[in-house]
Amino acid sequence: MRIKIDKNSDALYFRLDESRIVESEEIRPGVILDYDKDNRVIGVEFLGISQRATKEELSSLQFQTA
């Protein structure tokens, strides 16, 4: 898994798997899911991230495991 913040595009991208992306779908404005050949979600992109989170929130992402 990897996370990328692109300041130029104002986007945050979670990549869950390195499989080839075969389809993308905007499920709501500014939220795009990427799918592999088996229709599994392998990536999630948030556009306009500066409107969704503060710089402080983006600089210290926190993870929880269950």
Model regions: which residues?
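Small, basic N-terminal interaction modules of short regulatory proteins
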Residues: 1-66
